[in-house]
Curated annotation (Swiss-Prot):
The lineage of its organism: Bacteria, Pseudomonadati, Chlamydiota, Chlamydiia, Parachlamydiales. InterPro entries: EF-4, EFG_III/V, EFG_V-like, EFTu-like_2, LepA_C_sf, LepA_CTD, LepA_IV, P-loop_NTPase. GTP binds at residues 19-24, 136-139. Belongs to the TRAFAC class translation factor GTPase superfamily. Classic translation factor GTPase family. LepA subfamily. Residues 7-189 form the tr-type G domain. Required for accurate and efficient protein synthesis under certain stress conditions. May act as a fidelity factor of the translation reaction, by catalyzing a one-codon backward translocation of tRNAs on improperly translocated ribosomes. Back-translocation proceeds from a post-translocation (POST) complex to a pre-translocation (PRE) complex, thus giving elongation factor G a second chance to translocate the tRNAs correctly. Binds to ribosomes in a GTP-dependent manner. It catalyses: GTP + H2O = GDP + phosphate + H(+). Keywords: Cell inner membrane, Cell membrane, GTP-binding, Hydrolase, Membrane, Nucleotide-binding, Protein biosynthesis. This is Elongation factor 4. It holds the Pfam family GTP_EFTU. It is found in: Cell inner membrane. It is an enzyme of class 3 (hydrolase). The keyword Nucleus does not apply. Transmembrane segments: none annotated.
Length: 602
């Protein structure tokens, strides 16, 4: 059923906020086009990972090719490129959108437009995609279809007068969505020449066949035996197989302009394939690559250590396997005096970090412990050298620092209007600046904030959700680096610095953070036979201190009455013993203490 007429091809993706019904709508489209037999159907069919099904989110971009006979009697090839909806995966979304000519915007009739769908719609509009608004879950009691129509028009600026109402769960109105795709989404453009240009929008590692590259052919054709070249990495390969997703892989003779599918070329190293790269032929290369390619760099860093030191090799293998399918994950080996050997990992954002942690524990059964997440700070030293630091252990000598800069982000926050005061307080507490407040409708506001990235990577989302009873949403994009007073807060246990507890903080928050950590450690470190001071210090100055009391032993218990000097002698002896013990004694910090300190937060 491999028809090739450019006018009969439609490439589109679905944009939606988490839980607005994107994967369910994809399921209904697969059913309606008979792409998947009814017996093979399961919920969220395109979300392969258990984690995706459980969290109800899409992490990888999954394409699928469907064939559909329209009301005009013609058969169309419809390619759906499913995109991740979360802010951490914005670059993956932008590459998936670059492979499309149109996008369906799915909005929940009960919740209305949310921050992350707004961000992705802007990405689609920048690419000049045709956007088809669809209002989902119209059969819910809380559905307000007219209100949501007005919101789409006011907030996003799209004409929603003919937005389709549907219920992806029951299948109501889904046929109308398919017909609208045929009429509203334009077919792929005629290529200007026959040179091969194929956009890489995702890849997947297969243990037996190497890297499977997901591509959209823009011009030319790619078939088995083609000798190809990756334009960004300059690597050459021979194509062993090309095919389409229906939604399982199905080999085909060739992929032609406008088509979406996969390519296998015996690529053994995943880093040879970059998302956003252009594939061309070695013999007749395209003069220029497709626009928009950029190398993604991690934003948030954290140390990962195995709780059981013998599992270090297992952790190395686990991270290596995850990196095969997740090119944005950055890994370096490091060691800590408190935690032993582990890895310093870089992530695109906090959700990305959580997903990696959860996959290590779930898929590889390794219990891990992580240090507090950190961002990249820029230090300008007296000799003009600029140093980037993401780990408190690499903090430069304070006497040589001329200037410190930290990353700031631009943040869009959507909230019900009654929570404005509480969110403003949260913004102030996080050192944020509100630059704009817009009214979306009678009940909701859109706030634009500038915030330091360091302040939002730990608990900003949790606090936003708890203040707004779950109705607030936010997304952010990198803005710029700005000078800031970032200092190293050192935590000492029994006068010894413990690197795993130390962190980089803003000067205004150092004291309160130090107090919180010290108070937490007093609760979780067990009593010793001698007094243990716990201190938070900046440079040489102690800003917070707590003391773990010593276990007291009654050395005079065996003295019945008698002379006081006898008791004094025993007390003095005990005092000397404790002093000596304090000098040579080591404090064992239990593993749970590290977990608790991470939760100590602000």
């Amino acid at each position: 059923m491999h028809c090739h007429n450019l006018n009969n091809i439609r490439n589109f993706s679905i944009i939606a906020h988490i839980d607005h019904g994107k994967s369910t709508l994809a399921d209904r489209l697969l059913e309606l086009t008979n792409t998947v037999a009814a017996r093979d159907m399961q919920e969220q069919l395109l979300d392969d990972m258990d984690l995706e099904r459980e969290r109800g989110i899409t992490i990888k971009a999954h394409p699928v090719t469907m064939y559909y006979k329209g009301n005009d009697g013609q058969t169309y090839q419809i390619n759906l490129i499913d995109t991740p909806g979360h802010v951490d995966f914005t670059y993956e979304v932008s590459r998936s959108l670059a492979a499309c000519e149109g996008a369906i915007l799915v909005v929940d009739a009960g919740q209305g437009v949310q921050a992350q769908s707004l961000a992705n719609v802007h990405l689609a509009l920048e690419r000049n995609l045709e956007i088809v608004p669809v209002i989902n879950k119209i059969d819910l009691p809380a559905a307000d279809v007219e209100g949501v129509r007005k919101q789409i028009e006011d907030v996003i600026g799209l004409d929603a007068s003919d937005a389709i109402g549907c219920s992806a769960k029951s299948g109501l109105g889904v046929k109308d969505v398919l017909e609208r795709i045929l009429t509203a989404v334009p077919p792929p453009q005629e290529p200007k020449d026959n040179l091969l240009r194929a956009l890489v929008f995702d890849s997947h590692y297969d243990v037996y066949r190497g890297v499977m590259v997901y591509i959209r052919v823009m011009s030319g054709e790619i078939k088995r035996g083609s000798l190809i070249k990756m334009m960004a990495t300059n690597k050459n390969f021979e194509v062993l197989e090309v095919g389409m997703f229906t939604p399982k892989e199905k080999p085909v003779e060739q992929l032609r302009p406008g088509e979406v599918g996969y390519m296998i070329a015996n690529i053994k190293t995943p880093s040879d394939v970059k998302i956003g790269d252009t594939i061309t032929l070695q013999k007749y290369p395209a003069p220029e690559a497709l626009p928009g390619f950029k190398i993604i760099s991690p934003v948030v860093f954290a140390g990962i250590y195995p709780i059981d030191a013998t599992e270090f090799e297992g952790l190395r293998d686990a991270l290596g396997k995850l990196q095969l399918n997740d090119s944005a994950l950055h890994i370096e080996q490091e060691s800590s005096t408190a935690l032993g050997f582990g890895f310093r990992c870089g992530f695109l954002g906090l959700l990305h970090l959580e997903i990696v942690f959860e996959r290590i524990q779930r898929e590889f059964n390794i219990d891990i412990i992580s240090t507090a997440p950190s961002v990249i700070y820029r230090f300008t030293l007296d000799d003009g050298v600029v140093k980037t630091v993401d780990n408190p252990a690499h903090y430069p000598d304070p006497t040589f620092i001329r200037m410190v800069e930290e990353p700031w982000v631009k943040c869009h926050i959507m909230i019900p209007s009654e929570y404005l005061g509480a969110i403003m307080n949260l913004g102030m507490d996080k050192r944020g600046v509100c630059t704009k407040t817009e009214t979306m409708d009678a009940r909701r506001l859109l706030l634009t904030y500038r915030l330091p990235l360091n302040e939002i990577i730990t608990d900003f989302n949790d606090k936003l959700k708890s203040i707004t009873k779950g109705y607030g949403s936010f997304d952010y994009e990198f803005d710029c680096y700005e000078p800031s007073e970032i200092i190293k807060l050192e935590i000492r246990v029994n006068e010894e610095p413990v690197d795993a507890f130390s962190c980089l903080v803003h000067r205004t928050k150092a004291e309160s953070k130090g107090r919180a950590i010290c108070a937490k450690l007093v609760e979780v470190i067990p009593m010793q036979l001698f007094k243990v001071p716990i201190q938070a210090a900046i440079g040489g100055k102690v800003v917070a201190r707590e003391t773990i009391r010593a276990i007291t032993k009654n050395v005079t218990a065996k003295c019945y009455g008698g002379d006081i000097s006898r008791k004094r002698k025993l007390w003095e002896k005990q005092k000397k013993g404790k002093k000596r013990m304090k000098e040579i004694g080591k404090v064992n910090i239990p593993q749970s203490a590290f977990m608790e300190v991470l939760k100590a937060g602000d």
